[in-house]
UniProtKB/Swiss-Prot annotation:
Protein name, UniProt field: Translation initiation factor IF-2
UniProt biased composition (Low complexity): 87-106, 207-223
Gene responsible for this protein: infB
Top-level division of the source organism's lineage: Bacteria
Region (Disordered) location: 58-248
Source taxonomy: Bacteria, Pseudomonadati, Thermodesulfobacteriota, Desulfobacteria, Desulfobacterales
Segments of this protein annotated with the region G2: 418-422
InterPro entries linked to this entry: EF-G-like_DII, IF2_II, IF2_N, P-loop_NTPase, Small_GTP-bd, T_Tr_GTP-bd_dom, TF_IF2_bacterial-like, TIF_IF2
Amino acid sequence: MAKIRIFELARSLNMTNPDLLDRLKEMGIEAKSHLSSLEDDIVEKVRQGVFRTEVEKPEKVEQKRVRSNVIRKRRQPVKSEAEPEAEAPAAQAPEAEEVTAPTAEEAVPEEAADADVSAKAETPTAPETPEEAEISVSEEAPVEEAADQVPPTDEAVDPAEAAPAEEESSPSRKKAKAKKHQAAKIIKFPDAPQRLSNKGVLEVVDDTAPADSPAAPAAATPAGEKDKKPSRKDRKKRGKTESVETEEAVPVKKKGVFKRKEIVEGVALYDRTRGRMRKKGKGGAKVPGGAKTQITTPKAIKRKVRINESISVAELAKRMGVKASEVIARLMGMGVMATLNQQVDFDSAALVAAEFEYEVEKASATEEELLELNVEEDQGNLKKRAPVVTIMGHVDHGKTSLLDVIRQSRITEGEAGGITQHIGAYKVNTANGEVVFLDTPGHEAFTAMRARGARATDIVILVVAADDGIMPQTIEAINHSRAAGVPIVVAVNKIDKEGADPDRVKREASDHGLVPEDWGGDTMFVNVSAKQKLGISDLLDMVLLQAEMLELKANPDKKARGVVIEAKLDPGRGPVATVLIHEGTLSVGETVVCGIHYGKIRAMFDDKGAPLDQAGPATPVELIGLGGVATSGDDLFAVGDEKSAKTVSENRQQKQRTEDLARKDSISLENFFEKMQEKEEKVLNIIIKADVNGSCEAIADSLQKFSSGEVKIHVVHSAPGTIIESDVTLASASNAIVLGFNVRPSPKVRALAAEENVDIRSYDIIYDLIDDIKKALTGMMSSTFEEEVLGRAEVRELFVIPKKGTIAGSYVLDGKIERGRPARLLRDGVIAYNGVIGSLRRHKDDAKEVASGYECGIGIENYNDIKPGDVIECYFLREIKPEL
């Protein structure tokens, strides 16, 4: 069922929101605010209730003059039919009352309203007396009243004050008073307060009925008075029955301007503008009670806040026009502890804004719309692309050597220690087509790199040495491939080596779910030798066969998308990213978004270093032009304009800042004791600088594994690039050591490090780096001690020797008693004293130790309270060095 909001219904009924809410309350309909929704049946009920015309019985109106230009009339209860009518027909008045028009200074404008108001003079249909003129009232159309309009307040009028007002029957006296104090009438409520002219005939039409409904017939009353139904505003004010009757100017003899009395009901007689103007005039009458201050409520269209993905608490409060403390209080009520400058997400901002009757909408398109993530692909535009193959396996099993043979290059010779410590992307032309290869590290420290390689690939070549079999990193590579849903081709390498056993590899692989095809499984096994260049063509044929089964296709005519394989900071070229294009075509000069960074591509190079203008699907490229060093594994998107790229980048940066602030440790009453205990821990602060971003990530992850309950590694800073002076300054301030991987500091940086007493360590092989940090952490840890009991002796007799104290004549029960060892005195199985054996004698000779079955004299240092029957237990503490 369709619904309509209250502010929309009020607009269609030409009413203000507060009036309609009051009307709904009178009708028994609950509504919290003008943003609430109503069902269709309730809306129809409200429309009928608003437009229904009620005809009441005429009531006698008693007029009282309060001021010279205001007459109050009080409705009297209708008399019963039994009472005789006391009033006789009034004689016809000779003519209407005459007053002169007020001066411009005395004219008082009314405040703005949305409906036009006009008055129409009616010809008297009944005889008039000189004291009372016939008053005609037309139905009042509903209008939106100004927010700060104040309803007239009732005044208690004494009979003594009312009597003189009724006795004023002389037209001359009325003329004099009207000339002095009469104010001009309003013919229209403008949108803004303005001064109205007092010239001409001003007429007022009552606006309590809809404009399209016919006016109710006026019933003639005694003395020419006409009955008037109480307005909705009067009913709201506790059923007040007083109405205000103002005097209009009657014909002025000089200018021929005719004015008459008319009832003005439901309109405020005082507002801010009118009050200010009356203070200027000397004869202006004061309104009793003054003006009531009301808070201006913005229109519904203005009660909206447009934000991006997040907004600060201070900015949200500013846009809603409320105090920031109130917004923080509402957030605390929702369980969100936020400060003035802290960012809140879109959902939290929407909930808080709803508390203040505001709506929240997104100011810009979403990231999915800007990056066109949900655009459906036309299958007719897809074309065949080259497969992406990742080579994975245990360290030193021959992965890079195998790739060397395929590429006919010598990569291994350039690797430090003969092991791969980066992820590389290469495109190879074979006899059967192009193949893109990704070479991943095999060391355990590069787990994240292998995971990224598995996610970015179509096929995995799992290299296993025939003489080693399945190793820990081999199992990890299998798990990464399964998690990515990528098919595996097993390459059994080093088959030419002595002790090679390909069948052993098949058996161990079968235990992990890789069953060979010749054993009834679905996994391809190929025997190869990178050193002897055996089986390479068979391996490529298997890879291309697997690729044909996958039917790999991509659309080269759309905006490019890719993934960052590796990123680094080049001193001469700036941020450099190795990207594998998945789909679309990337061109030089295009604007791209990559993680939290964006930029315009200035140059592209292939895996051999040749410049490129365009790169199609399944093409590894090295691009320059990003605003910062991208994170390995980030997705790259080509966008149409720089503005969209900047919007996406700023939103992502804001999210990252919010997450970083949330991760920062803060002290509270709940975690105070825990933080105090952490301060007692030994912390090794480290700054990591490497040649590429992936190496920084791998080193940081490996070192974090060494943290224990006693020692902890804190990575203060980690970034790609060479070691610079700011790194040394940061290390000096944070008491950290600087670890460089494949980078070297300049002589100037070394001099600064020596001056600041900062330790800089440079490594080329990750083995050495991890071992050194492990030794450093071990040295920081405290040793533990284990108690070992040497022997026990029973006290049988006591000897007191001057200057020596009490000597216990004892019998060694088991083990041995050694001089200088710690000992404890046991009495009835309870420890009576802990000390050290100070003296040990056997047959008047000092002894170093006494074995079991022998008698001896034992003296305990600084203790003489020994009794026969006590047991002396000798022991020592064995030191156990910590290990990580």
